[in-house]
Amino acid sequence: MKQIGTGSLWTQAFRFVVAIACLASPQFVCAQATTAPSSDSIVQHDVPMKTRDGVTLYADIYRPSAPGKYPVILMRTPYDKSVNWAVSPAHKMVLRGYVVIIQDVRGRYTSEGEWYPFRHEQADGFDAVEWAAALPYSDGKIGMMGASYVGATQMLAAIAQPPHLAAIAPNVTASNYHDGWTYQSGAFEQWFDQNWTSQLAQNTLQRLITQNTNALVGTPTLPLTDYPVFNFGQLPADGKLTAAIAPYYLDWLAHPDYDDYWKQWSIEENFSKIAVPMLQVGGWYDIFNGGTLRNYMGAKAHGATETARTQQHLLIQIGGHAGFGRRIGDVDFGPHATENPYTDVILDWYDFLFKGIHNALATEKPVKVFTMGANEYRTLDDWPPPQAVPTKYFLHSAGKANSLRGNGSLTASAPKVEPPDTYIYDPANPVPTFGGPLCCDEEHMEPGPRDQRSVENRDDVLLYTTSPLGSDLEVTGPVTATLFVKSSAVDTDFTAKLVDVAADGFAQDLTEGILRMRYRVSPEHTTLMNPGQIYEISLDLWATSNVFLRGHSLRLEIASSNFPRFDRNPNTGAETRAARTSVTASNTILHDAQHPSALVLLVMPSK
């Protein structure tokens, strides 16, 4: 890696993080707000709020100019309260009779204190809600909105139970900041976590320089300067990122197990503390969509109040983490994909709850999802849809399911006597990430559905495909791969993708998953494998809603890497954060009468 002298460290690193933060995603737009307030609104900038421990947080407040008391919508953000993507909806909401407060969270932009993700959001969120309720133009009803980490600030505030919090509307956010934000089934979410950390380092680095240039002395190297791939191929993973800029990142790497460090912030551990209605908004190609679905199901099942349990709503759109729209990746999903824009959805939510307006939310079913293939929104009674039928597609082959040239198949018939499929996983030559749920650098790696045939040409990717369908088949619900596996290594990964194969061969990825074998027993501790021993595992591919059209085929991809979305398993049993060497692994999928590996889907009844 290139070495950077301390004299030029801050200038090069700062220019770098500014550039990527501006380019990577609409959530990190660097331009200041350009939308001017109308004569119907009043804007107050940098309004202070003191937290219980004496730290001052600053907010911009947008409110109607007419005297009176109004419901409040609060956003608490680490991404800068003055950027246009936050401000533009505020003006629209003011015109609908809401006060909108956008607050920089602790340690970010104008607010004082130390930035450390998740650590202060319960207490600070509680304090912010109660402060907002006491403002002279507030009617005491406080709602919240926002995406990604701004969704996390809502969830964490909700489990703190501030008395005046009346509802929240999290968009594309996680349910657990260990599994689903930093790790997934034991594998490190490398592309997201290193991109997100580097983007937020823009402001952290600027604050450090402003406060004390000497804070950076002694850190002569920064992997930020080697972007776009953060030296992803170099081990160990945690050896370069400076603790002065992102100490939490090193803490994340130091806690691969699901331990008390993570449990203190886990939403899943605290669904029983959620006492308010929630509207969860997600996207089929969002990196947090599994968490969005779990947030809905968890609060509905375990919420603290009858209101919380009965007023959970779920909207899954077509899109990724950075936004929704008609086209994502290689696929145009048609005109219906642009329906349900987020700001309008949020306004309808709060009009219904806070103002008693009888809009669609008063009569619609609580779940609405965009169904790919049919390319339209559909409403459901619940998630997962109760009428969907669990259906197994069993894996078959003549012992050579490797690549598009192989003989793997999927059928409804259980296997009998069949040879297994084996491939070599080499950490030095991992299967590349191509599309799927990605954030936050579309310039270098585009998210969403991409034609997977370039990946499927590899011999270290197994393919199991149905015959072309004779009629449409709708799959809506969770997706799981139950596999019987063995390996020559003491630890390895298994990955899977559900793919919709069109008649012309276009292979659209729908959803995907991974399992690090050392965490197959529990996320709380590691259990290495015995080489050659057969294990039954379950890969969670989250969920989808897709109509496999007549003439299309279902396909299950299996491999042992998906890099750089996930870090590479070195196969040695060593923690990847400290690994300096790797070995190849011979990995095997069994499918016979004693080992009936299968893809498990929820199939909707024919109309």
Residue map of PLM features:
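Short beta-strand/loop motif that positions the catalytic acidic residue
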Residues: 274, 280-282
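Active-site-adjacent alpha-helix of alpha/beta-hydrolase-fold enzymes
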Residues: 290-312
